[in-house]
Design a protein with these regions (language model features):
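Catalytic cores of RNA-modifying enzymes
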Residues: 1-220, 224-228, 257, 268, ...
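An accessory alpha-helical subdomain
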Residues: 202, 206-208, 214-251, 262, ...
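A short C-terminal helix-loop "cap" of Rossmann-like NAD(P)-dependent dehydrogenase/epimerase domains
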Residues: 253-255
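Short, flexible active-site recognition loops that position polar ligands and cofactors
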Residues: 263-269
């Protein structure tokens, strides 16, 4: 099997199957041979693990995962890719392709069916345009997984790894911190991919917490509050929450002050615990 990161082979493979990379699917294939082992190292995957991969492309990361893990199940939405993967993954017995949209798949059922008795990890080179919805589904569905290790745009990685209460925090930062601990592992230059994106990429590892970081009575309401707070970044938390939730500003301001905060506080200055306090006072 030729090296899947060899650009001449990638071109020949795409030409053989009349395959044109799709901007709509955010396809950027890995062409840096040192990158797949580094990603798998960061994931901590070994022969005990079942691995759920999202967006295998032509199988560059997939082959490395299959070398290290007990089993790899890759979810792919592009119906043109199976013939290419049939060639590049030929002879890899612990690999299975699921041709579905990851946002529509019952992942709990899939994991139960494909990985009985195994610890499970997610490892993926995610399409940049849909990073947040995929991460939120993987976390919010409370899947029986130990970790998520994802290659994403550096800007998105900064948000995924940011601690709530810091300048870089956002709604997705709060969600990640609620469900997991996160760490930026390393960056990858644009030339590591074909076609080369215009931005630097980065790998983030998220380790799932056994229980959420804070206890809230109404999780759906909690995240609605967080999303509202960050929905208008240049506004104070009071203004943004009032606007986002359709509540009187006076009531929101009173709740924020009753929770012990200055009414002019910005959302990025609030921690998970702070949001929980504000939600509790709003609910009274």
């Amino acid at each position: 099997m030729p090296e899947l990161t060899d650009l001449s082979y990638v071109h020949a493979l795409c030409e053989k199957y009349d395959f044109a990379l799709s901007k709509g699917f955010g396809q950027n294939f890995i062409v840096n041979p040192g990158l797949p082992p580094k990603i798998v190292d960061a994931s901590g995957v070994d022969k005990r693990y079942g691995v759920l991969e999202i967006g295998p492309g032509i199988g560059v990361l997939t082959r490395e995962l299959a070398k290290r893990a007990a089993k790899v199940v890759s979810i792919e939405v592009d119906e043109r890719l199976p013939p290419l993967l049939a060639e590049t993954m030929a002879g890899v017995d612990n690999f299975k392709l699921v041709l579905q949209d990851v946002l529509k798949v019952d992942l709990k059922a899939l994991i139960a069916q494909e990985f009985p008795g195994m610890p499970v990890a997610v490892c993926a080179n995610l399409p940049y345009y849909i990073t947040s919805p995929i991460v939120m589904k993987l976390l919010g569905d409370r899947l029986p997984i130990e970790s998520l290790t994802v290659m994403v745009q550096k800007e998105a990685a900064d948000r995924l790894a940011a601690a709530p209460g810091t300048r870089a925090s956002s709604a997705i930062s709060c969600a990640v911190s609620y469900y997991a601990t996160s760490k930026m592992m390393f960056t990858a230059a644009p030339g590591s991919f074909y076609p080369a994106p215009k931005v630097t990429s980065a790998v983030v590892r998220m380790e799932i917490r056994p229980t959420p970081a804070v206890q809230v009575e109404d999780e759906e309401g909690y995240f609605a509050l967080v999303r509202a707070a960050f929905g208008q970044r240049r506004k104070t938390a009071a203004n943004a929450i009032a606007s986002g939730l359709g509540m009187p500003k006076d009531a929101v301001t009173a709740a924020i002050e009753a929770a012990g905060f200055d009414a002019r506080i910005r959302p990025e200055a609030l921690t998970l615990e702070d949001f929980a306090k504000i939600q509790s006072t709003l609910a009274r």
